[in-house]
Amino acid sequence: MSEIAQDSNVSIFSKNEKKARELILKLGLKPIQGVSRVTFKKKDGQIFAIDRPEVYKSQGGNFVVFGEAKVDDFTQRLAKAQESLQQNEGVLPAGQDAVSKDPQSIQADMQAAADSATDKPSADDAVDDAEVDETGLNADDIELVMQQAGVPRAKAAKALKEHDSDIVNAIMALSG
């Protein structure tokens, strides 16, 4: 009998669970990878949490979740987080202030930052004003890049020229 490595992830299923998994696959449910935690909140505020769940998605967009559901005591987790914060209160990275803000002021700060970013014209915006030579480019390709990347015609034409009329690379360059 071979040994199983200590850090390997091995699951042993019962006969009934194995049958249930086969039925899930027959129903066309697709497994979703990368889900580390699922929480369900009831109307009365009670929270159920499933750590390391197995999540499947149906063709209709519904999700099926398998795992051990536990009642999540949010107040206890919050108390632990506050306790650890108080222990580390004196230790802040350089240049940061311990300021508590309400949600409205945080949103106002975010809006101000977004407004200041849009007020500054960038070098790319100068391209919008200038005419770009569209010779050798297909008008349908330019329209497609404009639509997919959400950019003006001049930017789309410039990106297509830079990428030798490669639509995919032009869209990726403008989107990224």
Curated annotation (Swiss-Prot):
GO terms for cellular component: nascent polypeptide-associated complex; nucleus. Belongs to the NAC-alpha family. Keywords: Cytoplasm, Nucleus, Protein transport, Transport. It is found in: Cytoplasm; Nucleus. GO terms for biological process: protein transport. It comes from Kluyveromyces lactis (strain ATCC 8585 / CBS 2359 / DSM 70799 / NBRC 1267 / NRRL Y-1140 / WM37) (Yeast). Residues 14-78 form the NAC-A/B domain. It comes from the Eukaryota. Its main location: cytoplasm. PROSITE patterns: NAC_AB (PS51151). Residues 137-176 form the UBA domain. This is Nascent polypeptide-associated complex subunit alpha. Part of the nascent polypeptide-associated complex (NAC), consisting of EGD2 and EGD1. NAC associates with ribosomes via EGD1. Residues 85-127 are annotated as: Disordered. Pfam families: NAC, UBA_HYPK. Component of the nascent polypeptide-associated complex (NAC), a dynamic component of the ribosomal exit tunnel, protecting the emerging polypeptides from interaction with other cytoplasmic proteins to ensure appropriate nascent protein targeting. The NAC complex also promotes mitochondrial protein import by enhancing productive ribosome interactions with the outer mitochondrial membrane and blocks the inappropriate interaction of ribosomes translating non-secretory nascent polypeptides with translocation sites in the membrane of the endoplasmic reticulum.
